[in-house]
Amino acid sequence: AGILLFPRHLHRVPAWQSHLTRAGIPFRLRSENRPLAPGEVLVADRFGELRAAYAMAHRAFVGGTFVGGGHNFLEPLAQGVLPTIGPHWEHFAWVGKELVDQWVCTATTPQQAAQSLLLPAPPRHAVRAAFAAAVAAKTDGAHRIAHLLTPFLESRIHP
C-alpha cells in the first residue's frame, strides 16, 4: 500500500517535488521505474496512467474539490473505487446529487478527507456494479424523449 500522487498538470510535478522535500516526505517519480519503498509517495510524471492507478487503488481522493469547480470523480467509480471529494463539484453537477450522496464520500475539510481515506474500502465489484446501474438508469434519455414527442410531432405533420 502506498500513496500515489497524480498532479492534474505535469508542469506542476517540480512544485510537488519541492513541497514533499520540504515536508520531509520521501517520494519517487513514476518515470524512475523502480519499486515503491515503504513510506514513499509515488509522484506520477507521465500522462495516461490514472485509469490503471484507479484500477489498483483501494481508496481515492479527487483533487480540485476544495476549490471551486472540482475534478472528475466518475473515473474512480468506473474502476470500482469509492472516491472522496471536497465540497466543490460544480463542474460535475450534471451527474446528480443522488449519485453523489450515494456513491461519493464528501468531506468539508482536508482532515475529514484524510479520515475517509483510512476507512475500509467497499468491495470493488459492488461499487462498479452499483455505479454501472446508476449510469444505466440515466442513459437513453434522447430515445425516451423522442418516443414521447413522436405522437405530438406526427399530429402536427399529419393533422
Predicted stretch roles:
Residues 1-159:
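Nucleotide-activated sugar donor-binding and catalytic core shared by glycosyltransferases
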